[in-house]
Structure formats: structure tokens, C-alpha cells
């Protein structure tokens, strides 16, 4: 009986949302191929998402409404170790970015901060058509206002998914857009299509593999 009781406790603990759940994706851009690993856990009313892609690690801290409160990006090869936190509509940036020291503040544009829209757009747009938000562009750490818009059902890699398009706002909307794909039942992220670079850059395609 003791063994059965202990086994039940272990199963309960491992199934608890406080423990990390792991998801792996494959990213392809031209001839380049990389693995992306997501690990998430929920504890003390916070959501923690850890993302690893090659030499780069991202840590996101979100509240129950999926609003980003903190984002940390680390890449030793690029001499980057930067933390951004939001308090009272003011972003605090501290650390190093591409070898340059940063210690400054930036005022929010007044939108909700969703630094990793792939994580939560499926849930956010379940009963909405559009969601405005803001995020920092990872390659230059500039703050942009964005719009995510539900596009309905669409096939992605042979599977029915909920498609969501994300673009810049205003006049900039004509210059960049990308597509995210979500499982219609779990609302979890399963894929991405978009050009992440200058004109002529091959399209990046991300798909879930396990």
C-alpha cells in the first residue's frame, strides 16, 4: 500500500502545471535548420517560458493573462546578456547587447506587452478578431506596436489549424507580416511562416516535431 501511495503522489506531482512541459520545434530558413525547445512551467501565479535555439536562450515571465513582465535573452557567442522588465508602463533595460552595455528606460506605447506572441495568440484570439500589443524586435531591441488578427482555419503541413497573422501598425504594416498556426483544440502553437530579414531573405518555416 505504501508503494501504491508513493506512486500516486509521484504521478500527481509530475502532472502538476508547476512542472516544466517540453515542446520541440524545427526551424528552416533556406539551407539553415535549427531546433527550438520550449519549456514552460506555472508556479506562484506566474508563467515561465524558457526557449533555447542554438546558442541563444530566452526566459519569459508572464502573469495569468499572458502579459509579459520580464524578458531575458542570453547569447554568449554574440556577447548578449540582456534583461528587460516592465513596471508602471516603463521598460527597464539592463545588461549587454551584442557587446555593448545597456542601462536605460523606455516608455511603453500603452499596449499590452506580449514578447512571445506565439505562446499565447491562440488563446488570446479564441473569441476575438484582433489584438494590439507591443514587443521588442530581438535583433535591434527596438519597441514596436503590433497587431495580431485571426484568419480562420487553414491547412499547415497537412493539418487543420487556426491561422493568425501578425503585422506592424500604421504605414509600417505594408512592410512586414507573418503567420502563426495553432492547434484548434488545444490552442497551442504548432507552426510559423514569415520572412525574418531583408528583402530576398528566404522564408522561415517553423513546425512542431514533438
What is the predicted role of each segment?
Residues 1-6:
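Positively charged n-region of N-terminal signal peptides that target proteins for export
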Residues 16-20:
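Sec/Tat signal peptide C-region and signal peptidase I cleavage site
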Residues 21-24, 56-58, 106-120, 142:
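Short, charge-rich amphipathic segments
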Residues 7-15:
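Bacterial N-terminal signal peptides
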Residues 81-103:
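An exposed acidic His-Trp-rich patch
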Residues 22-23, 28-88, 133-210:
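Acidic, serine/threonine-rich low-complexity disordered tracts
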Residues 96-135:
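Surface-exposed beta-loop interaction hotspot
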Residues 8, 30, 111-115, 200:
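Low-complexity, intrinsically disordered regions enriched in charged/polar residues
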